[in-house]
Amino acid sequence: MENVVENQAAGHEAALSARSRAPVFVLGCGRSGTKFLYHTLLSAGGFAVYHAESNAFNLLGLRFGNLAISSNRRQLLDEYYTSKLFHRTGLDPIDIDKRVMEDCRNTGDFLRIVMEAIARKQGVNRWAESTPLHLLFLPLIKKVIPDALVVHIIRDGRDVTASLHRIGWIRPLPWDRARAFLVPAIYWRWTVGKGRRYGRALGSDYIEVHYEDLVQNPRDTLASIGRFIEHDLDYDRIQQVALGSVHNPNSSFRGDGKETEAATIGRWKRMFTPQQVRDVESSIGSLLVDTGYTLETPLTERHSPLPVRLMNFLYPLYFDFKIWLKSYTPLARIADKRRMGIAESDVGPDAKSETK
């Protein structure tokens, strides 16, 4: 598929309210359906089509420091132009260079400049963003992009746990390898809990959507999201256009073959033993119930052994500490560039943009 596709909504502008032009952030814990919902919005038309996560706040803003400093902006652009993140925009450096150097003062400015340039090139007036980790940066995002609308997609934490455990995305500490399946469960609780606290402070600019509702009752769910963002999310059109993961589900269980999104619901029941289900539900049961899910393990049986209780206490502190290190220490300036699609050897005055 080409990086930039023709947007069929181009040329059909009408008088629109400020909210109907506002950027939309589709956020959630990893493996919760953020990409699926993001591609659903893009398939509806009227949004800039960008087949990548921007990683603006969780990587670019941390790595390149204070963008009010001209030299930091220059360094950001020089490295950004060599990255897959930029290649997938379909832009040329001339499309953003002057405006970034003259007008950009923070990460929000940079993201808006890039996404608005994509939108202009495609003839639309709106953009969306779907980096899952941006859920942890909601207060900053809302500060620097005040008109941002946030759709927090929440999926059953047990299915998220099964998916994250399958791909080994979150590694346990060495002494917890025997209970590695619990680490993504605790991460889900930590991430979704923070996202909900941050989101509810945004008032009418924040909405929560369940992945299961989007998959099992798409018309009504899309109608609700459409009212929130003031955008026509026509289900039939979305199915016809079917960009990205709307057409090809992003499953971590590749051995299952091409399956529908609906087939991913409740997979944890087949993957975990009753003992593992008990431990997972003892770790995240309260948040599962708060977000509308039913538990399998009776309350009287949800008692965890001491090692599990220690994990429930220590891992959130560990996750908080990692975020603090990246946000408030020089560690971010030497962060791995792989999320940008840059190899260390690619950066330099002779670096060339990727053309494949």
Language-model segments: residues:
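The conserved 3'-phosphoadenosine-5'-phosphosulfate
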Residues: 200-278, 282, 299-309
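PAPS-dependent sulfation machinery
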Residues: 48-129, 134-135, 170-174
